[in-house]
Amino acid sequence: MAVAGQLCLLYLSAGLLARLGTAFNLDTREDNVIRKSGDPGSLFGFSLAMHWQLQPEDKRLLLVGAPRAEALPLQRANRTGGLYSCDITSRGPCTRIEFDNDADPMSESKEDQWMGVTVQSQGPGGKVVTCAHRYEKRQHVNTKQESRDIFGRCYVLSQNLRIEDDMDGGDWSFCDGRLRGHEKFGSCQQGVAATFTKDFHYIVFGAPGTYNWKGIVRVEQKNNTFFDMNIFEDGPYEVGGETDHDESLVPVPANSYLGFSLDSGKGIVSKDDITFVSGAPRANHSGAVVLLKRDMKSAHLLPEYIFDGEGLASSFGYDVAVVDLNADGWQDIVIGAPQYFDRDGEVGGAVYVYINQQGKWSNVKPIRLNGTKDSMFGISVKNIGDINQDGYPDIAVGAPYDDLGKVFIYHGSPTGIITKPTQVLEGTSPYFGYSIAGNMDLDRNSYPDLAVGSLSDSVTIFRSRPVINILKTITVTPNRIDLRQKSMCGSPSGICLKVKACFEYTAKPSGYNPPISILGILEAEKERRKSGLSSRVQFRNQGSEPKYTQELTLNRQKQRACMEETLWLQENIRDKLRPIPITASVEIQEPSSRRRVNSLPEVLPILNSNEAKTVQTDVHFLKEGCGDDNVCNSNLKLEYKFGTREGNQDKFSYLPIQKGIPELVLKDQKDIALEITVTNSPSDPRNPRKDGDDAHEAKLIATFPDTLTYSAYRELRAFPEKQLSCVANQNGSQADCELGNPFKRNSSVTFYLILSTTEVTFDTTDLDINLKLETTSNQDNLAPITAKAKVVIELLLSVSGVAKPSQVYFGGTVVGEQAMKSEDEVGSLIEYEFRVINLGKPLKNLGTATLNIQWPKEISNGKWLLYLMKVESKGLEQIVCEPHNEINYLKLKESHNSRKKRELPEKQIDDSRKFSLFPERKYQTLNCSVNVRCVNIRCPLRGLDSKASLVLRSRLWNSTFLEEYSKLNYLDILLRASIDVTAAAQNIKLPHAGTQVRVTVFPSKTVAQYSGVAWWIILLAVLAGILMLALLVFLLWKCGFFKRSRYDDSIPRYHAVRIRKEEREIKDEKHMDNLEKKQWITKWNENESYS
């Protein structure tokens, strides 16, 4: 009841017209759309079929299944479902077809049997089949042993929708009487699908509940004329066998629902043999479609080929259609998969189109048509016939959950299917498009019509409009404009043109000959006016707008009707380069009153959408500046040079030439320039009449690669006058430059095409610009020229480095490697910081820049030199340098304190140098190329944008310097770093980007005294000093230095002096014994301090 209530509410909003999404020849105008509705909750429209009754009268009907319709009086049930007949020429409701109006409650139940779940017509004058797949057979009613089996059954009706002969009636229930239970035939559900073969010979049933819902297909003879053809034994045929009942012969696993959808035809596998097509939408969890053939000997239906679905739970095979889309005589197969989904692509439902390759299906790759998300696109697929009469059948696809429901119309073509829908019908009643019927002309206009059902108890019939082709011709007199020939025709310029346009129509069928009212339209220079330019012509008495219209009547096919008018040329026109285009087009006029055909409003024809809407002719100007023979033989020549533009100024410089090809080194410039020079001079000065005439409509067409776009042009010089004009297309991929009309003899022009390089990428290696000169004058050697340039991308990367500190010291005692536990025990801290700057294009599309550091790990004898503790980065993603094991190789404990200075104060170092016993200074330079073993540390600079920095934290290995370099005054350690770019294109140019960092290492003073001078040297120096002092005293004594002077010699003579205060060095808070004596000072400055 909940479902019924819901459907009732849906019915209240149904009944409105479908809206047109994109239009072709299915008429969607309100008065031409036919609507039929059923009882609320009856599911009127669940199934549809078009039926052509020939006897006792010619009728074309729409049959509508309503599987939830109320029961007939004698069916002893509430809802049984039913079948309705709809006459589209009548405004009244559809009529219920009365059959199955009895019931035996002791042996059967028709409650919710869903009569009308499917309905099919055999064709003109043929039978009709409709089924109730939930029909129940009962046994032992009202007893404890009561059982029910859902066999399902079908009714066959004669063409007049009555039961008339032995083949008619409801005895089509082949599961009745067989083994029961769902493992066999107890849940047979015959009639979920049923159809007739197109040759009228067979009726085909699907029973998807058989054999634990494996499903089967059964084919039975349905043609009394077989006896007249001496065919006395033909079937029935069944998957698994009519008598064998061998479920192992079913070609799909359990729960596959084989027989859920059906179609058939010849020309699927063989041109002569019929093939049955059945869907199994749950086979292998995705669905399958099986091609079956008859086996005369065993009466089996055997599989010929199986199509497998590609999406999990996609219901591949929910509906199938056999149709020859390309009209090659081989039937193609269309398969719906309404629950196919693709989350990334927002796909909800799909239809697969398999184009037949002369009966060979193994290598056929299907064309997939996709629906929108959750639309159930493909729940119904139908062959709707050739609705536009172009010779290729068409299909319709339903998508009932796309908004309120949609039906997509796809046309066939010589190549198969046109994947873009030619028309989309949009419903205003919910679930529009659940069922579709077509391939029959209901309104007798020779074009098949379309019926669309919904789950909201409504059906909409769309009538097809006849498609006509209108042949259009234009003649203009005179066909060329001679500005020197003027006449008294009424035009201010004295030049007139007579324009005549004629029309005739053709259509299918050839007997379709109604008079058609059209509006003929003549227009001149339509595109020129759209671009905002004024027209050079106007029609007489039509004002300034060059447009003329006239109503015409085409009385029948291939009967011509014409219109004629005079066109005036405006005065003083400047544009004589371009011809004057004149177009003719038509519109079908709707008559004020429309006649009715078969009680239906007349459907107006529509123009073929595949035909050109307009026809055009161009009127050219007569050429001037030609030779005596009135033939212009021009001699256009072109030269080019590539250059670069300096900033935003109009200053250009030529590109360097490398191996004969200009080379563009692209850094940060945004534009390049192509200098073009065009001349028109005689090729042979001795015979100037040979060529070099005026080049009429001279034009240069420049076509640019995807990496370049047109920006502007600059005219440099021209002779004898400037008349250059360049216009680019919308995306800047082509520029048309008008050189002049005419580009006269001995003319020349030089100009720049400025091109933007914003689309040049690191993959761009060449620039090819196609240059083509055009003129309406005679010149045979105007071959296109390709301007070529090589592109080199120069990366503006630089690296700089600094060491902190740049001077360090070593000293103390030697500590073995095994004894070290933390980095503080290694030696002085040195931090190397490298800054990388990118001033050019981002590297995101190029690859990864890598900083290569030649790390001085150890000296030549294998002893440690610099111990690398840690690598950190700024402005980069998390960095991982290789080889990773070279970083903190010994796994020492990291110190987070500030670095511990091992060096002495600077002043002490200076004094130690002053008192050095050896004036010759010893030093050494350590670098990778001479005396140090280095490791290449590679650090990818991922995420590098404009700048980044890398910090390498290291320790000087103190013990190595104590053991190896304590005798030296100092050492220099050189560390080199450079950048390279991996995965770079061949045209990447990376200038040398490297740096060198120097660190100076000094020994402390104690180390220098202890290790630099032996004790015996000190002893000898002391003894030598004493000896020299004794010798000096002896010499002074010999010279009388120690004798007392006489009185007169001792008269004092005074000289004022000041003695500087003695400078005493303080060490360890004690006075040093050796005091340095200062020289006498005889002059001083008052600003100085003396004692």
UniProtKB/Swiss-Prot annotation:
All ranges on the Extracellular side of the membrane: 24-1011
Keywords, ordered alphabetically: Calcium, Cell adhesion, Cell membrane, Cleavage on pair of basic residues, Disulfide bond, Glycoprotein, Integrin, Lipoprotein, Membrane, Metal-binding, Palmitate, Phosphoprotein, Receptor, Repeat, Signal, Transmembrane, Transmembrane helix
Residues bearing glycans: N78, N223, N284, N370, N731, N746, N927, N958
GO CC aspect terms: basal part of cell; basal plasma membrane; basement membrane; basolateral plasma membrane; cell surface; external side of plasma membrane; hemidesmosome; integrin complex
FG-GAP repeat start-end pairs: 30-95, 101-166, 176-229, 244-300, 301-363, 364-419, 420-479
Binding site for Ca(2+) 3: D441, D443, N445, Y447, D449
UniProt modification remark: Isoforms containing segment A, but not segment B, are the major targets for PMA-induced phosphorylation. Phosphorylation occurs on 'Ser-1064' of isoform alpha-6X1A. Phosphorylation is not required for the induction of integrin alpha-6A/beta-1 high affinity but may reduce the affinity for ligand. Undergoes PLAU-mediated cleavage at residues Arg-595-596-Arg in a time-dependent manner to produce processed integrin alpha-6 (alpha6p).
Matching Pfam families: FG-GAP (PF01839), Integrin_A_Ig_1 (PF08441), Integrin_A_Ig_2 (PF20805), Integrin_A_Ig_3 (PF20806)
Family, per entry: Belongs to the integrin alpha chain family.
Designated name of the protein: Integrin alpha-6
Natural source organism: Mus musculus (Mouse)
Record lineage: Eukaryota, Metazoa, Chordata, Craniata, Vertebrata
